[in-house]
Regions:
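Short, highly charged low-complexity linear segments
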Residues: 110-115, 135-137
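Hydrophobic structural elements of the Rossmann-like NAD(P)H-binding subdomain
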Residues: 1, 73, 116-119
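Structured catalytic cores of enzymes that bind and process phosphorylated ligands/cofactors
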Residues: 46, 85-87, 137
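A glycine/serine/threonine-rich, flexible loop-to-helix segment
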Residues: 14-18, 120-144
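Short intrinsically disordered, low-complexity coil segments enriched in acidic
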Residues: 1-8, 144
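Catalytic loop of short-chain dehydrogenase/reductase
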Residues: 5-39, 51, 55-111, 123-125
């Protein structure tokens, strides 16, 4: 499971009804490194976490000591699909990029029998990472 997330620069502090010039100035004053770091953690780090485990996942498949095939799960965010940048443009963009990468991996990893999935929980979702992990590691594997 690849899970990471920082928001990066946000619209916090921008007055509601700001002029276009004020809006542009607010965005222009963001630290570009903060914006880039958001992608480095939310997208790049999640991708390389998956890459780091590919051979181990393949060994698990070849061992065949469980019914299901190996899979990778990346935690994205509902913000990846939201047109309103509630957590900021870098956050939404980085989480959308993570979704797309996992979709591409879902196709690329087919010959190796490794599944690739992405979860995109929202703020009040029952599918938040902690909840999902509790289901994955429950003795009876039930979802309430």
């Amino acid at each position: 499971m690849a899970n990471s997330g920082i928001t990066g620069p946000t619209l916090k502090g921008l007055e509601k009804g700001a002029s276009l010039a004020e809006f542009r100035n607010h965005l222009w004053n963001w630290d570009m490194n903060d914006f880039t770091q958001t992608f480095a953690l939310n997208t790049t780090a999640a991708f390389f976490t998956v890459v780091a485990f590919l051979e181990l996942l393949d060994k698990g498949n070849k061992a065949g000591n469980v019914e299901q095939k190996s899979q990778v799960i990346c935690i994205s965010s509902a913000g990846a699909f939201n047109r309103v940048p509630m957590a900021g443009y870098a956050y939404a963009g980085s989480k959308a990029a993570a979704v797309h990468i996992m979709k591409a991996l879902a196709t690329t990893l087919v010959p190796y029998d490794i599944r690739s999935n992405v979860l995109a929980p929202g703020r009040k979702s029952r599918y938040r990472p902690r909840t999902v992990l509790s289901y994955l590691f429950a003795d009876d594997c039930s979802v309430s």
